[in-house]
Amino acid sequence: MLKRTSLSFVNDNLKKKPEWKILDIGCGYRPNDNATVLADIQDLAKLHKNRNFVKIKDKKLPFKDKEFDYVIASHVIEHVEDLEYFIKELERISNKGYIELPSRLGDNLIFENKKDHIWWFSYDDINNEIIASKKNQILEPFVTVSTGKYLEEIFRESLVLELTWENKIDYKIDDNLRNENRMKISFLKLIKKYLSKKIRTLIKK
């Protein structure tokens, strides 16, 4: 079962479960405060020296079946080459968790995402499933990660998908999502149009 949620709602519930073993996979530099175990392909043990950190070395995750009560995968799946295998691994090590993904708009805006992200996502609210395809860069990116994080605070529902799952992560891969025939939008053209419009507006005044 997969459905929409919010990170604040998830965190509030996790705070009420101090006995749970919670994994933050792909924790990066800003792990979830509720996680009892952190994991990443980078060796961040020194950075997280006061927490239980595990370095991921192989495709198969170094954890036992159903080892965790909850697993957090925030901005991770878009980086994974073998999407199907990784999702199966999440289902193997836990029965429930939280998934956070950039929306297609959010992904296209961020400059640093241009080469790092492999997958593009939308969410089917009728069938409650993730729709994934290989990423297509339609909009020339012009926003830095730090600015993107700030924008997420204001326009979170437009830039981020927040999902919770139990027992099974429903998804399908659909390359029609790519809109490959769409014309690429140049940032310079956007600026020119904006300045042109601004100048015309000022002249009218």
Describe every region a protein language model picked out.
Residues 1-18, 190-204:
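Long, low-complexity intrinsically disordered regions enriched in Ser/Thr, Asp/Glu, Pro/Gly
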Residues 9, 15-106:
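Conserved SAM-binding loop
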Residues 84-92, 96-205:
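S-adenosyl-L-methionine-dependent methyltransferase catalytic module, highlighting the catalytic core
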